[in-house]
Amino acid sequence: MLAFAARTVVKPLGLLKPSSLMKVSGRFKAHQDALPRLPVPPLQQSLDHYLKALQPIVSEEEWAHTKQLVDEFQTSGGVGERLQKGLERRAKKMENWLSEWWLKTAYLQFRQPVVIYSSPGVLLPKQDFMDLQGQLRFAAKLIEGVLDFKSMIDNETLPVEFLGGQPLCMNQYYQILSSCRVPGLKQDSVVNFLKSKKPPTHITVVHNYQFFELDVYHSDGTPLTSDQIFVQLEKIWNSSLQSNKEPVGILTSNHRNSWAKAYSSLIKDKVNRESVNSIQKSIFTVCLDKQVPRVSDDVYRSHVAGQMLHGGGSKFNSGNRWFDKTLQFIVAEDGSCGMVYEHAAAEGPPIVALVDHVMEYTKKPELVRSPMVPLPMPKKLRFNITPEIKNDIEKAKQNISIMIQDLDIMMLVFHHFGKDFPKSQKLSPDAFIQIALQLAYYRIYGQACATYESASLRMFHLGRTDTIRSASTDSLAFVKGMDDPKVPEQQRVELLRKAVQAHRAYTDRAIRGEAFDRHLLGLKLQAIEDLVSMPDIFMDTSYAIAMHFNLSTSQVPAKTDCVMSFGPVVPDGYGICYNPMEAHINFSVSAYNSCAETNAARMAHYLEKALLDMRTLLQNHPRAKL
């Protein structure tokens, strides 16, 4: 239920250039230690905000009932006060009172497959190659680019990011390389080898469902050049031509409990265990995909976004993955490329910073051809497939096929304007887009719904995310007034501006640690830890409605013309991600086909219309020049 974790909004960040590229030992620790600790907000403040957030999404009777429960919860000396004190004690003892709980509840205890339900896919711009040579050359350059970024992490010279003048926690950058999720029966874990005594020097390459260990550093510690990597990729490609191999990787796409059982039988065999260890330890994974069926240009982006998110099923590339791996870059022969990442380790922005760096790097011309030195043959990772494992693979194939058939995903490139228009109106582009989403949803369904937009808590040490609730009394007043003929246009403009400003104010509160969602989660988990009976406010209908996010959304801004995508977090909801560029906006919209009420193409259409109608409204009523 908590897979909504992920979706992180961060405004474009200012970067501090490192003063030198020498190893700055201890610089990372000093930076991290100086960050403020995540506060526990005052109890009454969070409960007031909770009641306010319920108004647009529950009935008056439900709200009145919840108000009673909230009043009981916060009586002097009552259960709320006791739990609040417990949280405050926890905050004094820990580096971050939330991060460990959040990692467990949002990710590691989440039992649905990571594919679609948790791990975001990233669709990158189509490259201009159309053959094997081009595919391998680009993959080699991409690998070189990631290693270039890794050197900044290793040397602690990564530019510190800022948000609103405040330095941000950089810890997630140290979690995304040489790391992997490991399935467990009730709870998964994450292993990270970046800081181990002997950090890994290899990556994993997958082709035709076959896994290889490719060393990307020479014995003297210098990285291979893209020319040298290209030669190694050719060797891998040539030694994995047979396409009838069992797709062991598809096991990682299954329900976490099923995968945990299959995993324990898989690694009983020493050969398998060593192969799995190699994948888990590798710096990252590169998937050399086979071409997908040709489709018309207008559905191409949606089709390829699916490849990045889930691999297209067992007949295509879903077996050409190890979905537990934190970073998997995907390069196909037809020029399509992207990535998929396992969400437990990090939110979108650090991933996007890496992607931006790598995509810039791939455009650099090769100035000198590097000398061709003899390089060892990349090591093929062997798997011994027992009948039991073969059976597990068959089940995983069937399951992913059902999941993919159920996913309705639509890419929309909104060409009419980008960040430029809201900025010209002195409005926040993110808030403008969120209010357009509210308008689109209201026009389809005639009501508001619980809406999740992630806010970054990286101003705080080890901060992850909190929730911006985009459905507000102000947004509801606007969406009702927008199509009401009795409301004059000038008043609609005022309602629109008020709604956008209210969203902006909520965002500012959230990034300063003053939103209520994670606080309520903390109180609930504190109750479980203290073995007290679950307080009534968490057993209430309003709470269930508030946590049923029909719109799960995320702004993930990038310099690269790309977009992230993920599945809805509820069966009757939408997953919406967007990257606002200067003059256009990239959207991905997902829904489930099994829900008759939701439809990704219809939502995309209504979203486009909402954005255009809001622009027209503002253009017809220009603000007086001050």
Curated annotation (Swiss-Prot):
A motif (Microbody targeting signal) lies at residues 624-626. The keyword Transport applies. Keywords: Acetylation, Acyltransferase, Endoplasmic reticulum, Fatty acid metabolism, Lipid metabolism, Membrane, Mitochondrion, Mitochondrion inner membrane, Peroxisome, Transferase, Transport. The keyword Mitochondrion applies. The active site is at H343. This is Carnitine O-acetyltransferase. It comes from the Eukaryota. The gene is Crat. It is found in: Endoplasmic reticulum; Peroxisome; Mitochondrion inner membrane. PROSITE patterns: ACYLTRANSF_C_1, ACYLTRANSF_C_2. Catalyzes the reversible transfer of acyl groups from carnitine to coenzyme A (CoA) and regulates the acyl-CoA/CoA ratio. Also plays a crucial role in the transport of fatty acids for beta-oxidation. Responsible for the synthesis of short- and branched-chain acylcarnitines. Active towards some branched-chain amino acid oxidation pathway (BCAAO) intermediates. Trans-2-enoyl-CoAs and 2-methylacyl-CoAs are poor substrates. Expressed in flagella of epididymal sperm. One of its GO terms (molecular function) is carnitine O-acetyltransferase activity. SUPFAM superfamilies: CoA-dependent acyltransferases. InterPro entries: Carn_acyl_trans, CAT-like_dom_sf, Cho/carn_acyl_trans, Cho/carn_acyl_trans_2. (R)-carnitine binds at Y452, S454, T465.
